[in-house]
Every structure is written in structure tokens, then in C-alpha cells.
Amino acid sequence: MGKTKKRKQSITLIEMMVVITLIGIISGALAFNMRGSLQKGKVFQTEQNCARVYDVLMMEYASGNLSLKEVIANKETLLDNSAWCKEGKKLLKDAWGEDLIVKMNDRGDDIVVLSKKLKSEQRG
């Protein structure tokens, strides 16, 4: 009886290219979806920062020691020294690293906190 040799089946170059192409397509789809989620996360974080800055500054104003103009002028110091938040200066940045805008409203009776980048993201 003759011995039969078993041949090893190897992967051809074409099969390997097909697998790599499929991996690339799947990775691209995941990366595209991830980008949208990251943008939504930045929008949410910026909205939360704006709300927290507003709340802390209005609490300082409500304490009765400072006028609205003084609160806005001293926002960095007030946020850093506030018992209501940690790392107050970090709150004055949006998720894209740009400074938040803190100003008085048109009537002069309230504070407005906004982000230029957030406005452009919400429009687009």
C-alpha cells in the first residue's frame, strides 16, 4: 500500500486580500458612526458646562454680595473658589477647548452663558 500525502491547504493571496478589504470596510463604518457619537457627546458636555457655570454664578449673585457686572467680571475667581464646583476654570471651556462666553442679557437682569462652537454645531 502506498502512502498518501496530505496536502496542507494554504490561504491564497486573493483570499487574504478579501479578508483585509472586509476588515477595512467594517472599520470604516464603525469609525464613521463613532464620529457622530463623539460630536453628540461634546454637545452634551458643553451644554452641561454652560448650565453649571450659569448656576454657580447666579448662586454667587443671589448671595447678595456682588452685582451682576461684578459676578461676570470675576467669573474665574468665583468659579475657582466656589464650594459648588471643583476645578471651576475648566468649566469655562467648552468640549472643543474654546472659552465660554459669559455676558449679561439685553435687559441687564440675567447672565447668559454660551459657546460659539455649540451654536455652530446646533445649526449644522
Swiss-Prot record:
It is found in: Cell outer membrane. InterPro entries: N_methyl_site, Pilin-like. Pfam families: N_methyl. It is a peripheral membrane protein. Keywords: Cell outer membrane, Membrane, Signal. GO terms for cellular component: cell outer membrane. The keyword Membrane applies. Residues 1-31 form the signal peptide. The keyword Hydrolase does not apply. This is Putative outer membrane protein TC_0858. The lineage of its organism: Bacteria, Pseudomonadati, Chlamydiota, Chlamydiia, Chlamydiales.
